[in-house]
């Protein structure tokens, strides 16, 4: 055995894996120290920097969409330039019971609760990995072992054996030097994933709100249609009774009785279908509230309880990109794929890790605190991938394909978002025209019914003729109930298509498990 400290000699160092340990001084070769200092001083971040996409100048939702003005028809709706979607847009219906149910749904709906839990999970995972990659790892170790040692292990003659106890207490420190930014890119990808989950949670909230509103609107419309159907059944029933009386007196044939009888049967079938839809709507509303169908009594809604929102925000293309949570989530997914490409690229560069430990080693626990028992070490390791059988190149190509896929998915999300806004804008225009036409029909039927009633009182027409006017009036009321419900529901669809407004307080509360901003990492949506 030589008494020379081998760590102080310049020995050949493998290029692929370099390790050195220091005792009582920095004994590394000069060129190694220079290389490490240059690598640390020249820290960079490899891979492409993500930049939030923007729309091409001149892009509009519809070629002839009104920038501001009025959707023609009864109960005009105005598109107001410069107005954005309200955080509480459902309150524009001015229905206190609807507001209460929306709040219950946001608090108790399992889907929204699951989305929030997934968001918190993503935030906590990002925080854990971020701290592990950017901060030193410190561990305490205490070991008590009993060993049998032979001098033959060192080539000494005789092979004398020793049996002893060994106590070891130490503190170990490890710190990865992120020279080429692989760790920073990994943290960036995790933050982008957390941002994506935040937007998915927001999308779940907005979808739930729209579903509650449209369900309430459908209930109110169905109740109005049921009321009109009941009035229709009453008039058709009386008309059938009179027809049968006249047939019994020989004034009418059996064929003339069959027609009103079939109409009455059809109306009864329609009433049962409407009643079934109403029951199913009530069950669906309870499910949105996170309740069982018969758990709690729900309020009844009528069209008179709901008011049509008159002032709607203008659909601005640039605002769509920032307001719709599905677009923001797709952008964050694109950002994550870009950051993962940087992680893959950094994997082909050298990886430097600093390690150190300090402690004591003695033959008995009582001797741990003696000066002679102290031990320490400091080391650094550099690993440079050289040949991995083409795995690194394949991984890079796969990461580049993932970026292209995420970019294409983002473009598709934007296109579909613009399509949905265009659809609902057209729907609002046609809904207003349809409602105006149904009201014209209603006014004409009511005028006809009033004249028929006057003529009947004067003996100018028969009672069957009066009943026929009542039947037409009931049918007109059914049409206007459907038109009112459709317009109210499409208005909710319009707010959903705009994406609503993100509530900063709600997002801050839900993202309580997000990565700490003190780490020095910039926001996921910012350009790197």
Q: Residue ranges of each PLM-predicted region?
A:
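Small/polar-residue-enriched beta-strand and adjacent coil segments characteristic
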Residues: 48-53, 87-88, 94-104, 108, ...
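Short proline/glycine-enriched turn/loop segments at secondary-structure junctions
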Residues: 295, 368-371, 482
């Amino acid at each position: 055995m030589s008494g020379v400290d081998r760590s102080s000699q310049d020995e050949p160092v493998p290029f692929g894996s370099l390790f050195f340990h220091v005792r009582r001084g920095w004994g590394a070769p000069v060129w190694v120290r220079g290389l490490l200092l240059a690598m640390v001083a020249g820290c960079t971040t490899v891979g492409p920097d993500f930049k939030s996409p923007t729309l091409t100048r001149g892009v509009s939702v519809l070629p002839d969409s009104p920038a501001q003005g009025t959707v023609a028809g009864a109960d005009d709706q105005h598109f107001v330039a410069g107005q954005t979607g309200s955080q509480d847009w459902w309150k524009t219906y001015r229905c206190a019971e609807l507001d209460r149910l929306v709040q219950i749904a946001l608090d108790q709906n399992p889907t929204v609760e699951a989305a929030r839990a997934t968001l918190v999970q993503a935030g906590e995972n990002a925080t854990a990995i971020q701290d592990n990659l950017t901060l030193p790892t410190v561990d305490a170790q205490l070991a008590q072992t009993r060993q049998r040692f032979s001098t033959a292990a060192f080539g000494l003659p005789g092979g004398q054996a020793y049996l002893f106890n060994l106590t070891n207490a130490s503190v170990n420190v490890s710190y990865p030097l992120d020279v080429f930014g692989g760790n920073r890119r990994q943290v960036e990808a995790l933050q982008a994933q957390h941002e994506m989950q935040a937007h998915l949670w927001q999308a779940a909230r907005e979808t739930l709100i729209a579903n509650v509103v449209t369900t309430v609107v459908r209930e109110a419309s169905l109740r109005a249609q049921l009321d009109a159907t009941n009035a229709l059944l009453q008039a058709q029933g009386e008309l059938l009774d009179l027809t049968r009386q006249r047939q019994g007196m020989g004034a009418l044939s059996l064929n003339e009785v069959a027609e009103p009888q079939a109409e009455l049967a059809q109306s009864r079938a329609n009433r049962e279908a409407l009643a079934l839809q109403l029951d199913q709507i009530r069950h669906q509303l309870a499910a949105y509230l996170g309740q069982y169908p018969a758990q709690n009594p729900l309020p009844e809604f009528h069209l008179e309880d709901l008011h049509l929102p008159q002032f709607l925000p203008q659909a601005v293309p640039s605002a769509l990109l920032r307001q719709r949570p599905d677009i923001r989530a797709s952008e964050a997914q694109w950002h994550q794929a870009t950051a993962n490409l940087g992680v893959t690229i950094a994997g082909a560069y050298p990886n430097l890790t600093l390690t150190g430990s300090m402690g004591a080693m003695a033959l008995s626990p009582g001797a741990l605190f003696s000066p002679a028992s102290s031990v320490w070490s400091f080391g650094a390791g550099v690993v440079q991938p050289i040949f991995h059988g083409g795995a690194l190149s394949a991984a890079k190509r796969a990461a580049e394909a993932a970026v292209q896929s995420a970019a294409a998915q983002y473009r598709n999300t934007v296109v579909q978002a613009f399509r949905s806004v265009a659809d609902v804008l057209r729907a609002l225009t046609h809904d207003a025209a349809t409602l105006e036409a149904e009201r014209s029909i209603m006014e004409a039927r009511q005028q006809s019914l009033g004249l028929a009633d006057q003529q009947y009182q004067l003996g100018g027409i028969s009672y069957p003729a009066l009943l026929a006017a009542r039947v037409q009036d009931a049918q007109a009321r059914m049409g206007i109930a459907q038109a009112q419900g459709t317009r109210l529901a499409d208005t909710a669809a319009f707010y959903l298509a705009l994406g609503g407004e993100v509530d900063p307080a709600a997002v801050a509360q839900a993202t309580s498990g997000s990565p700490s901003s003190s780490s020095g990492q910039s926001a996921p949506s910012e350009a790197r």
